[in-house]
Amino acid sequence: QGWTITAEICCAVDTLLASANPDVALRDRTGAPYVDESGGWVDLWNRDVRTYIEELCTDLMAMGVDEIILSRVEHPFAEVMYTREIASSLNREAFCMNFSIAVREEIDKTMKDKNVHLSARVPHDVLTTGTDNGQSMDNFLKVYDRLVIETETYSDDAPLFTEKKIDSTLRFVPQMTWTFGGGSWILD
């Protein structure tokens, strides 16, 4: 009692999926599958990728998890080519939000029926300087129940939520290497 069973799914960086199904891989300027130090990237615009993530979420809910954390819901820093034609006016934030909204809408009924939360893991930069990878705290809080953020400065970070009138004890899950009293946290 008092424990939450969570599962984490890495979304945009999936070397195995990109290798097994090259049709879903992002492409570099030469047309080769895009790979960086993180691994092989898949195209979150691609319906097959979204369906794959949605099916993983559905399977995890059937197994009884209380919360699903989607990590690496982001766009690479490099310029890439997508697996399908998209409007040129769409930016990196649209890349992340389109995926996030589509996944949420597809699994929302099952999540409500099973009382499961959908969260996103984001880098600490989302709280402070912002990111160039398409992740936005304001946008993600419209889709995800909570944000999991790696931090060593919880006492400094929590006010960033309260300034925006967001309950940091409910919407901000710090991931730390040490424990503290109260709230939700993930310990590495």
Please place each PLM-identified region on the residue numbering.
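Acidic (Asp/Glu)-rich catalytic clusters
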Residues: 1-2, 136-144, 161-169
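Aromatic-lined carbohydrate-recognition surfaces of secreted/lumenal glycan-active proteins
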Residues: 4-14, 69-72, 93-134, 148-152, ...
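Active-site-adjacent "subsite" loops/lids of carbohydrate-active enzymes
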Residues: 12-58
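Active-site-proximal loop/short-helix segments
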Residues: 15, 20-23, 66-97
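Short, electropositive alpha-helical surface patch
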Residues: 19, 25-28, 123-144
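An active-site-proximal structural segment forming one wall of the substrate-binding cleft
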Residues: 41-73, 136-139
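Alpha-helix N-cap and loop-to-helix initiation/capping positions
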Residues: 44-48, 52, 87-99, 132-135
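Short, well-ordered alpha-helix to beta-strand connector turns
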Residues: 65, 144-145
